[in-house]
Amino acid sequence: MNVCVMGLGNIGLPVVQHVSKVYRQTQGYDISLEAVNAVKKKGIDASTELACADIYVIAVNTWHRNGYSDMSAIEDCTKQALKLNPDALICFESTLAKGTARKLAEKYNSSNMAVCPHRWWKQEEDKYGVIQLRVLGALNQESQKKALDFYNTLGIPIHVVSSLEIAELSKLVENTYYYLRIAYAEDLKLLCEDNRVSFEELREAVNTKWNVDMAEARDGIGGECLPKDIQILIDTYPNMPLLHGAISTDKNYRAKIAHNPFGSKPETQQIEENNNSNNKSHGT
């Protein structure tokens, strides 16, 4: 069984490393020679020329730019892979806008397609690496069986859902949910600062309740995934005022801390600055 991992960036690199431990005939592919050489240095076959494979794992970037969801790299990889092997199983691990996989299956006449979004987190790769529970949706029963066989062989536990679209949305909703949590914390922190109340002490207090897990508020919502994924979800479902409000909250928060950084005036702010000095960054 030949496996090709397409896209050797932050996600594709750990993926190809893991896959190559299980499947001897594994190749990494990327248009970046630098990315290819980084994989080769780890003793794994890689190239800027795409090879024929039985399974293609697509882990390239997707974007939200110029006001729309950009899935162009996904389509380009799908087109190239199916040109080499029309019967190959295509496994998307990238973030996809809802409906992307099905549209590509119809456009390029593929009957073997699955969506299994990554949940990899660089800051805690040992705990949240390639091997962790993942969501998988497939085009049909045959695709589902092939994809399950593949991921089971890799030792990756799978939660099966009924469609490609549910799997696509799961990644967007996960990251949007976290975005909303952080935006609420940002709003609350500004409220606390205006009223000379310690946000960190308040957060610690409310987090003692079993069903409360208030996020931290730091220097705005960053990372590669959170700001992008909430916009992609809005493209699909524009009539969600809560999401628009969260984006506005983060913009407002960023503007205020840029103008008047925390820790420069009241004692409560200095306490929060010190407490946050060792915080980990937000995940993606």
PLM regions: where:
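NAD(P)+-binding Rossmann beta1-loop-alpha1 motif at the extreme N-terminus of oxidoreductases
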Residues: M1-A51, Q270-N279
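NAD(P)-dependent Rossmann-like dehydrogenase/reductase catalytic/cofactor-binding core
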Residues: N2, C52, K145, E193-T284
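Electropositive phosphate-/nucleotide-binding environments in soluble metabolic enzymes
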Residues: Y29, Y68-E75, K98, Q141, ...
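Alpha-helix C-terminal capping/helix-to-coil transition sites in glycosyltransferase folds
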Residues: A51-C52, I131
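Rossmann-like NAD(P)(H) cofactor-binding subdomain of soluble oxidoreductases
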Residues: C52-I55, W63-E124
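Internal alpha-helical scaffold of NAD(P)-dependent oxidoreductase catalytic cores
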Residues: A105-A114, W121-K122, D126-V212, T236-N239
